[in-house]
């Protein structure tokens, strides 16, 4: 298991034929050896699983990954009734460069993002070791 910083950018689609590097997410997640979310570590330290949403219109938000029943994952921003973006099959996705991730926005529109970087986050690894000491 390793803590990883992941950059997702909007993939090509009808509204953005070339995709967009200005629309995306920066994620800090624990990944297993197959590049998938390490759910057991998430359960221990959910507060370290952070999301930074970036948009062209400067509607940037910071939030956390949340898990509901089954394989229902969301990006949550703030209060319990605040914006949530649904993540179909999030627990099954790999987060390796070139892989694709789907995000359903708060209006129910499906957007596809491509993993453009996935690098170790040693600071988070130290936080984890400190938390378990």
Feature locations, PLM:
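Short, compact, well-ordered microdomains
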Residues: 76-129
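N-terminal intrinsically disordered, low-complexity, charge/repeat-rich segments that act as generic
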Residues: 1-42, 50
């Amino acid at each position: 298991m390793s803590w990883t910083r992941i950059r997702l950018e909007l993939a090509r689609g009808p509204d953005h034929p070339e995709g967009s590097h200005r629309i995306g997410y920066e994620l800090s997640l624990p990944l297993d050896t197959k590049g998938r979310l390490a759910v057991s570590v998430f359960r221990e330290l959910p507060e370290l699983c952070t999301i930074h949403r970036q948009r062209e219109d400067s509607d940037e938000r910071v939030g956390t990954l949340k898990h509901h029943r089954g394989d229902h994952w969301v990006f949550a921003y703030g209060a319990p009734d605040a914006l949530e973006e649904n993540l179909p099959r999030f627990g099954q996705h790999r987060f390796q460069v070139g892989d694709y991730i789907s995000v359903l926005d708060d209006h129910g529109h499906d957007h596809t993002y491509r993993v453009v970087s996935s690098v170790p986050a040693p600071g988070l690894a130290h936080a984890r070791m400190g938390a378990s000491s």
